[in-house]
Amino acid sequence: MNDIILTSQKLYKSYHDGTSTVEVLKGVDLAITKGDRIAIIGPSGSGKSTLLHLLGGLDKPTSGLITLGNVNWQKINEKQRCQLRNQQLGFVYQFHHLLPEFTALENVMMPLLLAGMAVKDAEEKAINMLEHVGLKPRLAHKPAQLSGGERQRVAIARALVHQPHCVLADEPTGNLDEATASKVFDLMLELNKKMNTALVIVTHDQRIAERMDRVLVLHEGSLYARE
């Protein structure tokens, strides 16, 4: 059985500023399998977030191939990309990106409702997921009524509620104090193990990187395993 869920092959990404071309990624190859724990590290501005956006179908490469399951990102239209993202990927960012006018429960229900799930079923799954992250008593609270760590836990619940094959996380603990960051990261690893969801984290935090199964370095456009 093939457990590879997300791949990039010979991935290039360039930006033009009007007078010159900046090559950010130069032939990046990556294979992500079920349950993987991967940290991507590298200097600021090296293209780590760009790589994550490309893997998630949020941006298009200059050239190369990105495959999610058996689907080539470049061969489908934007509507199909949105549907595939919502079915198979979860995203967690440094800023939680919760919708401020909605409660924690409503924020976590959102991806399920967008996928066409009935409200009652979506509510049941969202409550269960918020219970998993220790927030069942905070279901009716809006983001402004939650602490930074609680908001990030809601964001994690939202990313995992539809049981994605892979979660792409960009500095998910970057805005949190050390103690809260450690608790949030522990939670991500626990859910990764329990749900067998691949976890790919872009981070500057060496303590986080050390706890992942694979540490990849992005430097001068190339991605390689840290020795």
Curated annotation (Swiss-Prot):
Species lineage: Bacteria, Pseudomonadati, Pseudomonadota, Gammaproteobacteria, Legionellales
Keywords of this entry: ATP-binding, Cell inner membrane, Cell membrane, Membrane, Nucleotide-binding, Translocase, Transport
Keyword Translocase: yes
NCBIfam families xref list: LolD_lipo_ex
Gene: lolD
PROSITE patterns on file: ABC_TRANSPORTER_1, ABC_TRANSPORTER_2, LOLD
Similarity section: Belongs to the ABC transporter superfamily. Lipoprotein translocase (TC 3.A.1.125) family.
Gene Ontology molecular function: any one: ATP binding
GO biological process: lipoprotein localization to outer membrane; protein localization to outer membrane
Domain ABC transporter: 6-227
Compartments, as annotated in UniProt: Cell inner membrane
Function of the molecule: Part of the ABC transporter complex LolCDE involved in the translocation of mature outer membrane-directed lipoproteins, from the inner membrane to the periplasmic chaperone, LolA. Responsible for the formation of the LolA-lipoprotein complex in an ATP-dependent manner.
Keyword S-adenosyl-L-methionine: no
Sequence positions that bind ATP: 42-49
One cellular component term from this protein's GO annotations in UniProt: plasma membrane
InterPro entries, A to Z: AAA+_ATPase (IPR003593), ABC_transporter-like_ATP-bd (IPR003439), ABC_transporter-like_CS (IPR017871), ABC_transpr_LolD-like (IPR015854), LolD_lipo_ATP-bd (IPR011924), MacB-like_ATP-bd (IPR017911), P-loop_NTPase (IPR027417)
Protein name in the entry: Lipoprotein-releasing system ATP-binding protein LolD
